[in-house]
């Protein structure tokens, strides 16, 4: 562009300088021709030639001026195109740099991530870095001292003083337990499932040769509810670092099961004599101190040798499984109260009613069964379900679902 101006500007300046002179000369020549008579032909011819040359030079300057304007227009279009190209190239370069930054500085390398997840050691290291571990009081020992410190921390943060805190009533808990028992009773009475369950259990039980088949004659599941009261939290005497709740339980109700069987005398030959027997056993009163605590069954003190019973018959129930993880431990204190009402009827024609020896024998066997399973130092362990919310455990009222439709 500068080179073009260098060559064209002198012509433009000359044309602009000569243009007024030529115009003035033309006007003067016209005026001169009109004002006087021209008598000399050579002078007229020279003037005409001069006028033609001026006109030719003017046309040439006009043409060069048009060419200059055309070139300026073309140069402006070329500069516009170059500006557009530069803008596009600049935008593309910025986008490319931004993509490189996101790929290498924001996102992780897929191969590195897969190799890290496949390595067990690195995964454990990452988990240890993710989990926030609070500092514990003391030396952080894993033994009894560390557990005692943990119990003290729990009591401190829950503002509970085990020495001075007054016993609590469990009225709200009694309502929930009563509602649960009521629903169980309603289901048992409507579907007769308790009758079928007991009948199936008795039919599958192995009986001695001198007893005939056992038939159910009476089932009474009661109509009253247990009362829990006087709840207090105490440190466990058997295990350091564990808290337990002691609750007084009182139940005054009538829970009855009646059976009928036959005593068979097989000597000197089978079925020599048959003695009909009818029994009815009722629990009319129970009271005692219930101990409840949460345990971890993976710990050594709650392993199978500690849980196992002494007698071979009562070691473990059939089809039972050893629980793992968090479980509920409960037992009753030895100073419990359990009252029975046993009714018996023996004989076919001449019948013996309520024989004391039979009543004491049955009561002794029932007490032994209860002591071997639930009286301290023995205890029962109930595995607790997972408390994490899950989709399969989610429910909603049926009325809400129908109203939505």
From Swiss-Prot:
Locations listed in the record: Endoplasmic reticulum membrane
GO molecular function, one term: lipid binding
Topological domains annotated Cytoplasmic: 108-405
Membrane-spanning residues: 87-107
Disordered, as annotated region: 303-324
Highest taxon in the source lineage: Eukaryota
Membrane topology value: Single-pass type I membrane protein
Stored InterPro entries: Mmm1, MMM1_dom, SMP_LBD
UniProt xrefs under CDD domains: SMP_Mmm1
Pfam families per the UniProt record, alphabetical: MMM1 (PF10296)
Ranges for domain SMP-LTD: 166-385
Any Gene Ontology biological process: protein insertion into mitochondrial outer membrane
Residue spans, topological domain Lumenal: 1-86
Quaternary state and interactors: Homodimer. Component of the ER-mitochondria encounter structure (ERMES) or MDM complex, composed of MMM1, MDM10, MDM12 and MDM34. A MMM1 homodimer associates with one molecule of MDM12 on each side in a pairwise head-to-tail manner, and the SMP-LTD domains of MMM1 and MDM12 generate a continuous hydrophobic tunnel for phospholipid trafficking.
Family, as annotated: Belongs to the MMM1 family.
HAMAP family (UniProt xref): Mmm1
Domain comment as written in the entry: The SMP-LTD domain is a barrel-like domain that can bind various types of glycerophospholipids in its interior and mediate their transfer between two adjacent bilayers.
Protein name: Maintenance of mitochondrial morphology protein 1
Species assigned in the record: Meyerozyma guilliermondii (strain ATCC 6260 / CBS 566 / DSM 6381 / JCM 1539 / NBRC 10279 / NRRL Y-324) (Yeast)
Species classification: Eukaryota, Fungi, Dikarya, Ascomycota, Saccharomycotina
